[in-house]
């Protein structure tokens, strides 16, 4: 067995151990960041003055700080919880800010006539968002 064969075996073993954890991390972060983005983006598109400013600050801060710094901050400050869930929390918060801006942009791109049509039909806000927008 050559050195190259040993290296290939070691790399395959490491990939076999790390790949399931990576896929779990991706799935959990995607789920939570989508949830954060949809909820906060919908709230932000309603343009409630104080809430809009707070969420705008959240978006600016989370998009301005590198993800690795957020990971290190949460890892150093949160002593309870596993490394996996600390990683999920920090990545989801950062990516949730990006998703929030995407959802907000989607709401703002809807034509004003569609909002007025829903208002003329006297649809509740949730029905307007689900069925019209």
What kind of feature is each model-predicted range?
Residues 1-133:
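Transmembrane alpha-helices and adjacent helix-loop boundaries
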